[in-house]
Amino acid sequence: CNGDAKEAEKFLKEKGLAAVEKRASRATSEGIIVVKTANAKAVMAELTCETDFVAKNADFIAVGDKIAETALAKGYTDVQKELSDMVLDLATRVRENMGLRRLTAVQAGSDEYIAHYVVIVVLKSDKPDALADKAFQEFAYDCCLHAAAFTPLYVKKEDVDAAYIDEQLEVFRGQVAELQKPDNVKEGIVKGKLSKHLAEICF
């Protein structure tokens, strides 16, 4: 580049982007989810990469934090070029395919509280004072943990369709059919299995 620093920088950047394009077809099955909250608003960003090693890399995690913080500060509700470019910049330095797959934002109302743990949960209360209550906030966080662990489908057990419960009972009875135990004991095991299953799919 004949000693021209700007030309050298441009050359290196173009070379880096060309390398990124070559890696674009590689599968990105690893990654991280970053959640940031402020002023009753939450932003969730999903960054993907090829390997678990990069997913745990401090620079990769820092980019995820920066993306979520920028989206939160600027009011972005989906993927923007400014955010994608942050990942692209890292990809030119780390020889691995990576990207910003998704980004979403949630704004809580005046009667709502946002909690997060890999997932975002918004709880609503008709009592404004409850939103600042420690027990209420801990409950919201517990809901996040439950959602992350089990991906529940219903709010409460009463919401579960009766036909679905009958199907599960049939499955569980099939599982204990060969046990050398009295029928009443088998039925107790079935009820226990159903109770555990409902606890997982409901909040």
Regions found by a protein language model. Give the residues of each.
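N-terminal assembly/interaction segments in proteins that build large macromolecular machines
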Residues: C1-F203
